[in-house]
Amino acid sequence: AIEAANAGKKIVILESQAMAGGNSIRSTGGMNAAKTPEQDKNSFDEAAGVEKTLATAAEKFADNETITALAATVKSQWDAYQANPQGYFDSVELMELDTMIGGKGKNNPELVKALAENSADAIEWLASIGAEVKNVGAFGGASVKRIHRPVNADGKVTAVGAYIVPILEKNLQDRNVQFLFDTTANEIIMKDGKAVGIKATGKDGHKVTINAKSVVIATGGFGANAEMVEKYKPELKGFATTNAEGAQGQGIDMATAAGAATVDMNQIQIHPTVHIEEDGNAHLITEGLRGDGAILVNAEGKRFYDEVSTRDKVSAAIIAQPDKSAWLVVDQAMVDKSAVIAGYIKSGYTVTGATYEELAKAMGVDEATFTSTMNTWNQAVEAKSDTEFGRTSFANPLATAPYYAIKITPAVHHTMGGIVINPKAEVLNEKGEAISGLYAAGEVTGGVHGANRLGGNAVADFVVFGRISGQSAADNAK
């Protein structure tokens, strides 16, 4: 919408909820981007991650032409970097490769390419409108440190969604973009095969009709629609969700009624680390904790998997535990660097202990086993070698008291399937043809993430394709 407004177009945004933000405002991680100046401010210590990705491509995706070609390009780049290591190693192609491997090769390569190629520029664009995300960290499924996060006035990492969304909203207000809150769109007006407006219903039931030269669907996924989730993936019946109430899938329904094709509707992600309170409320615990050094232990007080693997694999490992849950463990040094963790503590999500033994007692796990687990992990960090589970991202030892743990379990988080689009964010019909005047961006679309989304790619998705959809819609409205 900002891009379309910058092009001089009159914009109306229909929002089904009473406030802007949807799932995005709940995002606690950050935004992936490759080859940024912010990355170059970090020392490179992720060689093992790059080597592991190249090995995975060769061993598990040799029959995937896109992944094989990307791996060959990255291998050439990696060899050149090792011969002359300047700056921080990353590339657009490595981000593509990570995303394709994370998505099990089911992604649309053209969309992945657009995502990665435009990611660094999107970081600069955010900065230009007042949203700086310059703290770079590690996240699951990424070969290198690529996730960009905001920091607060104290220099501590803070939640990306609660930071970015108000800035986006202010920029829209400054551009006189009209918001209609509590207004649910329910039909795309079509005329002669073209999208020419929207029909909607207000909170009190009154009808709203908006005539337009271009329509952009950015309604999010369907993770809060339990019936729809169960329809496409029955095994997720009864799972809690991290999603905002508005994630009902209505945008997908409207688009298909207008002739749009869909893809990957059964690809639904469960996030591995969600804290569920006794009243059933689910709270997303950011993947950034694991990227910054946290570990997972089970009811026996033992580690059981590579914590920074992809979300699908970590979730499966947790579900395989007898109680389908685990403990996420951090130390005071991590708390001191993160306003997000401080928020979890304030909200009462944690148990704590001045020693490993005290924390184990608070968690209800065997003290000797847990203490041994912590000592073994700290030794692995010092050696930068995890012989138990092959983790390649270490940060610092968990050795600064007091210690904290959060009980977590997987919950429905992201729907990778949705409306079929092309790299211009044009909505396509079943024949692969663009529907004139109709565009889509973000979680309502399918194809970007394949069978599994990497943490940090959702924000990249909605910023990159949000900009593209606004530009395309504005061009169409000339």
Spans of features found by a protein language model:
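Glycine-rich FAD pyrophosphate-binding loop
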Residues: A5-S27
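N-terminal glycine-rich dinucleotide-binding loop that anchors FAD/FMN and/or NAD(P) in oxidoreductases
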Residues: R26-A62
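N-terminal leader/propeptide and maturation segments of large enzyme subunits in energy/redox metabolism
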Residues: E59-A122, G130, L328-D331, K337-A383
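An anion/pyrophosphate-binding glycine-rich loop and adjacent beta-alpha core
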Residues: E59-A71, I252-E367
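A glycine-rich dinucleotide-binding beta-alpha-beta segment and adjacent secondary-structure elements
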Residues: E187, T369-N452
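Glycine-rich loop(s) and the adjacent beta-strand/alpha-helix scaffold that form part
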Residues: K203-H206, I210-D279, H283, F465-I468
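Internal hydrophobic alpha-helix adjacent to the cofactor/substrate pocket in enzyme cavities
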Residues: I252-A261, M363-D366, T371-M374, D461-K478
